[in-house]
């Protein structure tokens, strides 16, 4: 869940240590043009730093020179921008760190396609990152669970500080809602209706595609 305290804004976390695994810069044997990385576990400063660094590397190495006709060694050499893939499986994490990854994805996808793949669970902060892939290149496993919910938080301190923190929580939620609306087929009003249920809202892979979090199920 998205939580706010005087130090951090967090989403629901698990006990597992966050992992960002850099899989390849050269691509798989099946598709050498696709480079991959994995975001697995909680989204926090450490995992956000690692996935951002990986995305920057993959973006900086996206352009390559290839034969226009691979079967003809004498064909013209052309410049090709190779996409990369981020595999996401997370229960959520820190909202600020989510936004740092999201903003980097927005910047990079202007020049390089980002394929996003959701597996296992894509919840809370993870839903925005799944949806932030290049339109038409976002996919989700048929058994993947998706969950969205409202920002939550807690603080201890003088009343004036608590009032200030509450205002900030509201700002974070409004920003989160607007970003989801920008990346999915949902309107701001639809998202707010879901969040007003004041509970975790779970979606099947089919529902996630219908609402625009992903484009296809595998």
Q: What spans do the regions from the language model cover?
A:
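Terminal-region recognition feature
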Residues: 1-218
């Amino acid at each position: 869940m998205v939580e706010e305290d005087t130090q951090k804004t967090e989403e629901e976390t698990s006990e597992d240590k966050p992992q960002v695994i850099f899989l390849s810069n050269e691509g798989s044997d099946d598709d050498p043009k696709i480079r991959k990385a994995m975001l697995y576990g909680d989204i926090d400063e450490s995992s956000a730093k690692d996935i951002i660094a990986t995305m920057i590397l993959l973006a900086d190495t996206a352009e390559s020179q290839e034969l226009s006709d691979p079967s003809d060694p004498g064909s013209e050499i052309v410049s090709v921008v190779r996409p990369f893939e981020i595999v996401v499986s997370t229960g959520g994490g820190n909202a600020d760190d989510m936004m740092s990854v999201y903003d980097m994805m927005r910047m990079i996808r202007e020049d390089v396609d980002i394929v996003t793949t959701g597996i296992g669970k894509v919840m809370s902060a993870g839903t925005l990152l799944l949806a932030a892939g290049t339109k038409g290149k976002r996919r989700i496993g048929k058994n993947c669970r998706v969950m969205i919910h409202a920002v939550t938080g807690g603080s201890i301190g003088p009343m004036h500080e608590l009032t200030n923190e509450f205002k900030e929580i509201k700002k974070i939620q409004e920003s989160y809602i607007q970003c989801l609306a920008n990346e999915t087929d949902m309107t701001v009003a639809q998202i707010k209706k879901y969040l007003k249920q004041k509970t975790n809202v779970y979606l099947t892979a089919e529902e996630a595609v219908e609402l625009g979090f992903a484009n296809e199920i595998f």
